[in-house]
């Protein structure tokens, strides 16, 4: 897609209806506005607040009773009563203030000479001449200024009427949440009706003005005046990019308190007209959403990807659907449904509405129910997902689990003994319709013939059982845990038309034995003028798993685990259940921690550990126990399988102060005297909203570059990552990120943004440039640079323009907490 710009329709119709001059502004104090002065709370964006004063007269003893207070009272013509001199008239919860008030002879209407003030609960109206019914709710104020205190809404009108049904009608009126004296924005309409009981307003010939400049016009508009949901048009989004003009006009439907919908027609000059929508619902403990979009015939668009033709999808329909539901049958039994699908792997690249959506790489399909008891946990699911690669290679198609049934339990005795039952039965399936009987298929990008390995060619069922027995003693000075587990896997496989002599019913039974132990030593010490409690925690771990032939086993969900601190203390070399790696190792290490003596808070932890192997690791992804990786063709895999010791792993986590924290990791191969992997991170996090992250990572043979496929051992991966968020003022935030791949001399991501947030409005402007890799090939020569600009306007109390992307910014900048408008 690329270079997509979301912004408000500031270039909308510059239409302004003829209208009378608005009333002259009033001083802020006459609108119940009180400045904060020295009492402003932290982070206050407004210079003050509206404070509603109490009534000057108490209510009458009976409904509709009228009470008055004035300097003088006299009879006028025709039996009318004339009150003068700071007149206050109250009937029920309505109070009228004026210098002179005339009550007609029928005593059912009062007429006041300006300046006047009419108060209702939560509402103040000031203006010129006014009249009000004494036997009903109707009232009228000329040249009115009004304030709705709780919603921080104010405005003016040539004439304001309170109708008998309690609604308010305003002629040539305005509406804003900006504080008095601030004319940043206001909504203006020739005929405005406010319904406080329902929480919305309507306006004809409405226009949005910024300053005194009209920037958008609506013949008719419905808008909220509080936080309640209302049906009506939402703010449009208008974008310009390499794909041309992109306009979306959403319409919100508040169908019921527990379900609603949004329709979003979208017109794109280079693609055509798309209809999108979303439906949300909540019924008791069940809730869900369904959203989607459909484009009947794509005009072709324009792609920033040099590997894709611009007309790749010309005349084709483009669509997506995403359904999510979560519910609960009982406190222990819940369920979840999800179904996502898109017409093609580039849908979100072309039509993603924000940065996060453009990065969507898969869509989940799931039906699951789970029971969580005190002992047993039962789970039944059917699960898969659509992988959004374009084109999608045959060997990258994911397996579906149709179904997957799990039953797990744990029993624990006071003596420290425990028993576990872990079981899973799953049927794995995927459609390899483009593969011939030899397992070969044609790569759409290169035209080359490729072959799917036999271990990935079968569909079938797997029964996996791992019961375990253990004992754990955990006194205050350490722990000891011997554990024995039985690993059992059996398969029923179907290779379809693939020619093979592999066993279609392979099985495996093997023990997994381990012994974990540790000691905890403590001492009191003093450093840097402070008292500390230091611990020394040596740990010793032994694991044994015999080798078993798994050369006929499939690969449904398995990958080799990366070396890590946690991996030192685990008997498993693979994820999933299709491979059980042989291991005979002893892991040893120690940790020391420094804790504040008075609070017990950990300020520093340092850990060092390593594993020693007593035999080679013969089982790899091929599963053959009789062969090792070829030393000449794949030296690194051979070395990892035959090395006597793991790298020495060092980890440091140092909370330098309340605001500064650092983390460091180092993987050092003492046999070759080389660093295999290293990373360092430094973070500053100020409660005032300032965040700084500095990161560095280096990895030997992190991946294989496209232009240097032969030089595997000498290839390294080096990255720099800098990100920040700076709150310059309570109203102004700056954010940024720079992720740099030093190996290939390219920026992986650049992000720069500014956010302005004041009393009545907010603006987010973010620019992003990133490397797009839309397939799973482990190369870089097909990557390309994409970029986008995100612009969001929020008119507080009225609505906003642009998609919310705060979640993405928080992920890109660890520690950053975006302001929610």
Swiss-Prot record:
Localisation: Cell outer membrane
Keywords attached to this entry: Cell outer membrane, Membrane, Signal
Domain of life: Bacteria
Family matches, as InterPro entries: LipoPS_assembly_LptD (IPR020889), LptD (IPR050218), LptD_C (IPR007543), OstA-like_N (IPR005653)
Signal peptide: 1-20
An annotated GO BP: Gram-negative-bacterium-type cell outer membrane assembly
GO cellular component: cell outer membrane; transporter complex
Main location: membrane
Pfam families: LptD, LptD_N
UniProt subunit comment: Component of the lipopolysaccharide transport and assembly complex. Interacts with LptE and LptA.
Record-stated family: Belongs to the LptD family.
Classification via HAMAP family: LPS_assembly_LptD
Function noted in UniProt: Together with LptE, is involved in the assembly of lipopolysaccharide (LPS) at the surface of the outer membrane.
Protein name: LPS-assembly protein LptD
GN (gene name): lptD
């Amino acid at each position: 897609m690329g270079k997509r710009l979301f912004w408000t329709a500031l270039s909308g119709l510059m239409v302004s209806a003829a209208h009378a001059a608005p009333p002259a502004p009033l001083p802020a104090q006459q609108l119940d506005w009180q400045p904060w002065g020295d009492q402003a709370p932290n982070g206050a964006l407004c210079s003050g607040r509206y404070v509603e004063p109490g009534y000057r007269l108490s209510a009458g003893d009976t409904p509709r009773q009228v009470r008055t207070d004035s300097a003088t009272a006299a009879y006028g013509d025709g039996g009318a009563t004339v009150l003068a001199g700071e007149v206050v008239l109250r009937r029920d919860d309505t109070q009228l203030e004026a210098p002179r008030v005339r009550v007609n002879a029928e005593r059912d209407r009062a007429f006041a000479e300006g300046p006047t003030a009419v108060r209702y609960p939560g509402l103040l109206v000031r203006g010129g001449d006014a009249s009000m019914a004494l036997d009903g709710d109707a009232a009228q104020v000329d040249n009115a200024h009004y304030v709705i205190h709780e919603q921080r809404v104010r405005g003016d009108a040539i004439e304001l009427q309170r109708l008998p049904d309690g609604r308010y009608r305003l002629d040539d009126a305005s509406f804003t949440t900006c504080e008095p004296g601030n004319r940043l924005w206001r909504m203006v309409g020739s005929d405005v009706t406010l319904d406080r009981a329902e929480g919305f307003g309507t306006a004809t010939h409405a226009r949005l003005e910024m300053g005194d400049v009209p920037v958008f016009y609506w013949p008719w508009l419905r808008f909220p005046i509080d936080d309640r949901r209302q049906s009506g048009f939402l703010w449009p989004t208008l974008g310009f990019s390499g794909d041309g003009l992109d306009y979306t006009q959403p319409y919100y439907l508040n169908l019921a308190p527990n379900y609603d919908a949004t329709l979003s027609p979208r017109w794109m000059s280079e693609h055509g007209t798309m209809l999108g929508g979303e439906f949300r619902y909540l019924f008791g403990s069940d809730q869900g959403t369904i959203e989607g979009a459909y484009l009947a015939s794509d005009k072709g668009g324009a792609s920033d990807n040099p590997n894709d033709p611009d007309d790749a999808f010309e005349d084709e329909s483009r669509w997506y659907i995403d359904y999510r539901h979560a519910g609960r049958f009982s406190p222990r039994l819940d369920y979840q449904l999800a179904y996502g699908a898109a017409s093609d792997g580039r849908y979100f690249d072309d039509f993603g509405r924000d940065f996060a959506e453009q990065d969507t790489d898969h869509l989940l399909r799931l039906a699951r129910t789970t029971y969580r008891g005190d002992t047993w946990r039962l789970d039944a699911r059917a699960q898969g997902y659509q992988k959004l690669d374009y084109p999608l290679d045959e060997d990258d198609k994911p397996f579906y689990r149709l179904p997957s049934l799990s039953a797990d339990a744990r029993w624990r005795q006071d003596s420290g003994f425990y028993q576990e039952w872990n079981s899973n039965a799953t049927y794995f399936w995927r459609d390899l319709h483009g593969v011939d009987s030899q397992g070969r298929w044609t790569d759409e990008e290169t035209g080359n013939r490729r072959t799917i390995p036999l271990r990935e060619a079968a569909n079938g069922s797997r029964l996996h059982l791992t019961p375990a027995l253990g004992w754990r003693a955990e006194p205050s000075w350490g722990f000891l845990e011997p554990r024995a587990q039985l690993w059992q896997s059996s398969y029923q496989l179907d290779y379809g038309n693939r020619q093979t002599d592999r066993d279609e019913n392979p099985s495996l039974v093997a023990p997994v034995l381990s012994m974990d132990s540790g000691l905890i030593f403590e001492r009191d010490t003093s450093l840097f003028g402070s008292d500390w409690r230091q611990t020394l925690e040596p740990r010793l771990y032994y694991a044994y798993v015999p080798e078993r032939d798994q050369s006929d086993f499939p690969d449904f969900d398995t990958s080799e685990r990366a070396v890590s601190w946690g991996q030192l203390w685990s008997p498993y070399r693979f994820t999933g259940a299709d491979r059980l790696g042989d291991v005979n190792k002893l892991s040893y290490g120690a940790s020391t921690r420094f804790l504040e003596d008075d609070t017990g808070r950990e300020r520093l932890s340092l850990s060092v550990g390593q594993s020693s192997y007593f035999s080679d690791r013969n089982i790899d992804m091929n599963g053959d126990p009789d062969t090792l990786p070829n030393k000449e063709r794949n030296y690194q895999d051979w070395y990892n399988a035959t090395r006597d010791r793991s790298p020495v792993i060092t980890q440091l986590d140092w909370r330098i102060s309340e605001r500064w924290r650092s983390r460091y990791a180092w993987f050092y191969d003492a046999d070759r005297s080389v660093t295999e992997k290293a990373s360092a991170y430094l973070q500053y996090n100020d409660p005032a909203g300032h965040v700084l992250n500095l990161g560095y990572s280096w990895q030997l043979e992190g991946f294989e570059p496209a232009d240097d496929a032969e030089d595997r051992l000498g290839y390294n991966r080096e990255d720099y990552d800098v990100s920040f968020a700076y709150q310059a003022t309570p109203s102004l935030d700056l954010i940024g990120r720079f992720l740099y791949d030093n190996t290939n001399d390219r920026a992986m991501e650049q992000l720069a943004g500014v956010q302005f947030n004041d009393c009545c409005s907010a603006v987010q402007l973010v620019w992003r440039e990133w490397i797009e890799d839309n397939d799973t090939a482990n190369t870089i020569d097909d990557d390309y640079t994409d970029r986008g600009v995100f612009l969001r306007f929020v008119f507080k109390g009225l609505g906003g323009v642009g998609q919310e992307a705060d979640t993405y910014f928080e992920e890109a900048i660890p520690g950053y907490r975006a302001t929610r408008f």
